[in-house]
């Protein structure tokens, strides 16, 4: 039976309350739903799922921990969902400002190092934002960051999941954003399951 090690990297959306003492604990977010679906639908493989999302992480912080939390583990597939905190912190009380150029440099550095120091396939998910009363000023920022992520995905990723576009389509059917997220960023169980389903669907070409 072929073994496949899948690593989830990201911020609080990926972390989702996982047990930090056990990186095989998937937490309560999309990694839990994705891993359950992937394992159930691909029983010819022996999967090892690792969740190393850390709440609050920005692109720079993910790069800083990349050796310990990715390179040393030598996974077969690395997925990355990062970037919304770089935008969010432009508007919070701490005023930690990361420019678009810095986000691109940080993200490119992450991807370059993964390519250089592992043989892992890369699955990238775009940052996303659902409508929320206090997040309107973040949408204009995200509209310039998403094309950066898309272009990096074209250059480095084996699979790209345009979550912001996918949520926009889903909201045409279920037009209430709170069905997926109370604050527009952190998914509730419905949102986590939805992302997990998109993830499990997107990863299929990497399991052949």
Give the role of each language-model region:
Residues 1-55, 66-74:
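Serine-esterase "nucleophile elbow" of acetyl-processing enzymes
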Residues 33-45, 61-208:
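Alpha-helical cap/lid subdomain in secreted, periplasmic
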């Amino acid at each position: 039976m072929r073994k496949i090690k899948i690593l989830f990297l990201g911020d609080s959306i990926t972390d989702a309350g996982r047990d930090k003492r056990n990186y095989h604990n998937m937490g309560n977010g999309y990694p839990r739903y994705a891993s359950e679906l992937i394992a159930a639908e691909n029983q010819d493989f022996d999967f090892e799922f690792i969740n190393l999302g850390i709440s609050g992480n920005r692109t720079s912080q993910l790069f800083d921990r990349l050796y310990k939390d990715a390179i040393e583990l030598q996974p077969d597939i690395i997925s990355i969902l990062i970037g919304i905190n770089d935008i969010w912190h432009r508007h919070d009380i701490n005023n930690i400002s990361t420019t678009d150029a810095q986000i691109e440099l940080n993200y490119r550095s992450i991807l370059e190092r993964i390519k250089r120091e592992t043989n892992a396939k890369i699955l990238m998910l775009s940052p996303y934002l659902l409508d929320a009363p206090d997040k309107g000023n973040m949408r204009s920022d995200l509209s310039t960051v998403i094309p950066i992520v898309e272009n990096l995905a074209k250059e480095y990723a084996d699979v790209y999941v345009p979550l912001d576009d996918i949520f926009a389509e889903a909201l045409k059917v279920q037009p209430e954003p709170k069905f997926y997220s109370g604050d527009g960023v952190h998914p509730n169980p419905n949102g986590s399951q939805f992302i997990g389903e998109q993830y499990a669907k997107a990863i299929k070409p990497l399991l052949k």
